[in-house]
Amino acid sequence: MNIKNNVLKVLSGEESDITPVLSVTQIAIVEAMEKTDVYWPEAHINADMMAILGSSLHELAGLECARIPFCLTVEAEAMGCTVDLGSIERTPQVTETPFRTASDIEVPTDFLNKGRIPVVLEAIKRLKDEYGDTIPIIVGMTGPFTLTGHLLGVENMLRDMKMRPGDIENAVDNSLDVCMDYAEAISQAEPDIICVAEPTAAPELIDPLQFKTIVKPRLEDLANVIRTKKILHICGSSQPIIHDMASIGYDAISVEENVDIAKAKHDLEKGGKVLRVGGKVMNMGGETSSKIVGNISSTQTLFRGSIEDVKEEVKKALNAGVDILAPSCGLAPRSPIANIKAMVEARNEFYDKIQ
C-alpha cells in the first residue's frame, strides 16, 4: 500500500485500503526532539530542522504523514506582531501587536518574504525531496478569523464584534487577504494537504450564527484559492456548527474528542453538497463529500493515558466511522511516543480482526 495514495483516496471520496492514521495538527513532541537531536525553538526558524521534526513521528512511530509548522503564529509574525518562540515544550505565542484598531490592519507588500514564511516554504521543498512519493506532506496555516484575533487580541476582537461589528468584518477581510496570499504561496510549493486551523471560531467563543455569517464566508473564499487537498480544523465542541463546516468546500473537517463522530457523520450527510465550477466552490444543498478527521484526545488520552486507553479510544473512533484517524488537536509536547505508536498499532489490529 502506498501511504500517500491511500490518504488522498480518502480525501477524494474514493474507497481506501485502510483508514489512514496521521495528524493534521501540531506534531512535534519532546521525545522525538531528543531522538532526532532537533529541538524547539530552533526548529521554528530553520528549514532543515523543521522538516526533520515534522517527519519525526513518521520515522519513529509510523504516523502516516509529515506535518509542518508547529504553531499558528507564522502569519501574525509576518504581519509585524512580536512572537515569543517559546521553549522545548512551549509553542510560540504572540506577545505584542502593532495594531490598535481594526482599521489599522494592512497587509505589507512584501508579506511573503517576512518572518518564518520563507522557512516554511523551504521546509516543504525539503520534505518533498525526502518523502514526496511516499507520505502526504501537510502544511498548517491560520484561518482569517483566528489571525484577526492575533492581530487585535482575542478579547478585543470578541468585544468589538458586539460593539463595532462592521469594523471587525473589515479586519477579518484584511486578514483573509493575508491568508489567501499565504495559501497561494504554500500551494505553489506543492504539499499534498493544507490544514486551515480556526480555533478562535469554536462555539465556546462565538455563537453558531456568528460562525455562519462572519467566519464561514471567509473560509469559503480561502478554500477557493487552495490548490491542494484541504482540511478545516476547529477546536472545541464543534457539533453545533458541523453542518456549516461540512458545506464550506473543504475535503475534510477535523474535530476534537467532544464531538460525537457517528452523529457528526449523520449531520454531514445532511450538510451542503459542493460543486466546483471554474475553481469556485458553490453550495448546492444536499449531501456533502467532506470527510471527518479525528478525534483521539490529545490533551488526555495521548498525553496522559495508557497504551490501553489509546487503543480503546481508537477502536471507538473506528467503530463510529471516522474517515481519517488523528489526534483531536495539536499534540502536547510531552506526549510519549509509545502512545503515538499505540494509535497506529490499534488501527492495524482493528483491521486485522475484520479481515
Language model: regions and residue ranges:
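Active-site loop segments of alpha/beta catalytic cores
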Residues: 1-31, 64, 89-91, 111-355
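A contiguous, low-structure linker/loop signature
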Residues: 69-110, 126, 133-134
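Surface-exposed, active-site-proximal loop segments in enzymatic domains
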Residues: 34-41, 79-86, 102-108, 152-165
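Basic, amphipathic N-terminal segments that precede the first structured/catalytic domain
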Residues: 40-50, 105-117, 121, 125
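Active-site nucleophile and cofactor-binding loops and adjacent substrate-binding regions
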Residues: 44-45, 70, 235
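Active-site-flanking structural segment that lines cofactor/substrate pockets
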Residues: 33-62
